[in-house]
A protein has these predicted regions:
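Conserved SAM-binding strand-loop segment of SAM-dependent methyltransferases
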Residues: 264-277
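Substrate-binding/catalytic lobe of Class I Rossmann-like enzymes that use SAM or dcSAM, i.e.
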Residues: 325-434
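Conserved class I S-adenosyl-L-methionine
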Residues: 218-228
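A short acidic, Gly/Pro-enriched loop at the edge of an enzyme's catalytic core
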Residues: 278-289
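Conserved SAM-binding loop of SAM-dependent methyltransferases across substrates and taxa
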Residues: 229-240
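Conserved beta-strand signature within the Rossmann-like core of class I S-adenosyl-L-methionine
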Residues: 317-325
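A short glycine-rich, Lys/Arg-flanked "PGG" loop and its adjoining helix->strand segment in the class I
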Residues: 304-316
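Feature captures hydrophobic
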Residues: 2-197, 202-203, 209
Length: 434
């Protein structure tokens, strides 16, 4: 992007804060902030407001602001200039240095703007010098962003260790997921046969579809890998009379799934085991196998070994249904902010492309004969989850901490946008064991 002389900046920002006498005044901080924000967002197509750390309000663009971007710390503005990528914004939102009021989905589009923003070095240095005068001021987070003692990460910096990422995704109580997953507790893509269907209806449709694709018959043996909360295992046993062996490495999910099996009177059909897929015996004893969204959490390097274990567990000719999130860019790479978010939830996870998945399936001696793209269904699923999560904001923040709520909200919104844009996909593959 070419540099712009100072007098070429049309400054589409307007100052909205007035003094008590009604006269509009600007301090040195406001002048510098105005200049910096004007340069960073001069080409941004959506109108929005900015509330600075001292309460001053600026508006960007024409029309009614879609959201208000609240900078609680002057240092965030400095970092926005210096790093010129959305990762710092993501970190700042999670830590409470940034607040978003209004349309959160629209605010997330700022990530794309920063992905494409390229400032010449001399111009970036000029903006940084301006920003440094702001960052030297001591800023204190306002009371409404104060860290809550319920979350172990509230005293940590915005950059969270990967071990905490595991805790965010796996080591949280079941009632957290119950608040937003839906009554079926299906932590994966639902299937909306109609856009008017509820989340519960769409989840039931997905469970039925999976069982039908696997051609489940009374007396079949089904291996449910990463069985989660036991939803598919109980559904298949209850509605199709199959024997299900579900495995999960998550103690919380294991306890919940066991309880569901007992409460639904399915102990004669369903066995839930706390185990890793790597411990599966190579007995070739299962008629069918299903794996709902584990590959995207494994990491690409582990996928061949995982498929080899599934192959060894199935009978020759057995059916395998794999339900996988894929990266739709050629290199299977993520932008910086998405990578940061995913590290908070699934630090070991890594998406790969659909083409690479097919290659892995073939190398593992699976013949893929049915593929369905479920990207639009995941968009609708995420919207429903997000609505549920936001409706439970107060209770989640009280029990899990504001930071945990923000990371999950950010992750769901970012995921929905990526599915909408086709950056990521969801593929349901059905294959036979050679």
């Amino acid at each position: 992007m070419s540099s712009y002389p100072v007098n070429a900046l049309a400054m589409p920002l307007s100052l909205e804060q007035s003094t008590a006498s009604g006269d509009i005044t600007e301090s040195g901080d406001i002048i510098h902030a105005r200049y910096i924000l004007n340069r960073l967002f001069q080409d941004y197509p959506v109108a929005f407001a900015v509330r600075l750390w001292n309460g001053s309000m600026l508006t960007i663009g024409d029309g009614a602001p879609a959201f208000t971007f609240c900078l609680e710390q002057a240092s965030v503005l400095r970092d926005m200039v210096w790093f010129s990528n959305p990762k710092r914004l993501v970190e700042a939102y999670c830590s409470g240095e940034v607040q978003i009021q209004g349309d959160f989905h629209a605010a997330m589009q700022l990530r794309e703007h920063f992905e494409s923003l390229s400032l010449p070095l001399h111009e970036k240095l000029g903006l940084v010098f301006r920003a440094l005068t702001l960052a030297n001021n001591q800023q204190v987070l306002p009371e409404h962003t104060a860290h809550t003692p319920h979350s172990p990460t509230q005293s940590q910096s915005a950059s969270v260790p990967s071990s905490h990422g595991i805790a965010l995704s796996y080591d949280v109580p079941e009632d957290f997921y119950q608040r937003w997953l839906g009554e079926q507790m299906l932590h994966s893509c639902a299937y909306f046969a109609s856009p008017t269907h509820t989340l519960a209806q769409a989840q039931q449709t997905q469970l039925t579809l999976i069982c039908q694709k696997l051609h489940l018959q009374h007396g079949d043996t089904l291996l449910d890998i990463a069985c989660g909360w036991g939803t598919l295992a109980c559904w298949a046993a209850k509605h199709y009379g199959v024997f299900v062996h579900g495995i999960t490495h998550n103690p919380t999910q294991y306890a919940y799934a066991l309880k569901q099996v007992q409460q639904q009177g399915l102990t004669h059909l369903v066995k839930i085991e706390l185990a890793d897929y790597r411990t599966l015996p190579a007995l070739g004893s299962y008629d069918k196998a299903a794996c709902i969204s584990i590959a995207d959490h494994l990491g690409a390097a582990h996928y061949p070994d995982f498929l080899a274990k599934v192959h060894a567990a199935l009978k020759p000719g057995g059916l395998f249904l794999s339900h996988v999130i894929t990266a739709e860019n050629p290199a299977g790479q993520q932008d910086a902010s998405t990578a940061f978010i995913n590290r908070q939830l699934y630090p070991a996870g890594e998406l790969t492309s659909f083409a690479h998945l097919l290659q892995h399936m073939d190398s593992a001696r699976f013949d893929v004969f049915n593929v369905e793209g479920l990207r639009r269904h995941y968009v609708m699923t995420l919207r429903q989850w997000l609505a549920n999560l936001e409706a439970q904001h107060a209770s989640i923040a009280a029990s899990m901490g504001e930071r945990t709520y923000r990371i999950w909200r950010l992750a769901m919104t970012a995921s929905a946008i990526q599915f909408e844009q086709g950056v990521t996909g969801m593929h349901q593959m059905l294959a036979t064991r050679r």
